[in-house]
């Protein structure tokens, strides 16, 4: 159910941005969803009509794109997309300690507006 609260926050952020730009309507928005977030894009699509009802985003086209997990090995600096998390192993040195670079955020990437 956290997809609904996430969608409400994204709609609110897009609404604020559109209002600052003097928009009359938001026609499309793009959301990036990291694989580690636990957010299912199918539920974002499901909840978008309800979350956007009565806002500038009502009737807009939603696009969700996945962001794969990307890490940097803390031992050798190699950047890679692990096969699994946890349990990732650097393909270069075999160590498991890594810094996550991408894949753990939900981001409002773009909105298209009508002025």
Short names for language-model regions:
Residues 71, 88, 106:
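Cys/His-enriched microdomains
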Residues 17-21, 92-100:
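Short aromatic-glycine motifs in intrinsically disordered, low-complexity regions
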Residues 83-86, 100-104:
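Short Cys/His-rich "knuckle" micro-motifs
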Residues 79-80, 97:
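Cys/His-rich microdomains that often coordinate metals
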Residues 2-4, 30, 106-115:
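Long, charge-rich boundary regions
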Residues 73-76, 90-93:
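Short cysteine-rich clusters marking metal-coordination/redox-active sites
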Residues 1-63:
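Long, charged N-terminal interaction/targeting segments
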Residues 66-70:
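Structured, basic alpha/beta domains of bacterial-type, RNA-associated proteins
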């Amino acid at each position: 159910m956290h997809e609904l609260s996430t969608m409400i926050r994204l709609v609110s952020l897009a609404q604020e941005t559109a209002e600052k730009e003097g928009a009359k309507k938001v026609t499309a928005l793009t959301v990036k969803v990291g694989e580690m977030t636990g957010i299912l894009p199918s539920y974002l699509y499901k909840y978008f009509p309800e979350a956007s009802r009565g806002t500038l985003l009502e009737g807009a086209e939603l696009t969700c794109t996945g962001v794969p997990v990307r890490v940097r090995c803390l031992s050798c600096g190699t950047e890679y997309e692990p096969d699994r998390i946890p349990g990732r192993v650097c393909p270069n040195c075999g160590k498991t300690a890594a810094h996550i670079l991408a894949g753990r955020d939900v981001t409002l990437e773009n909105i298209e507006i009508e002025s």
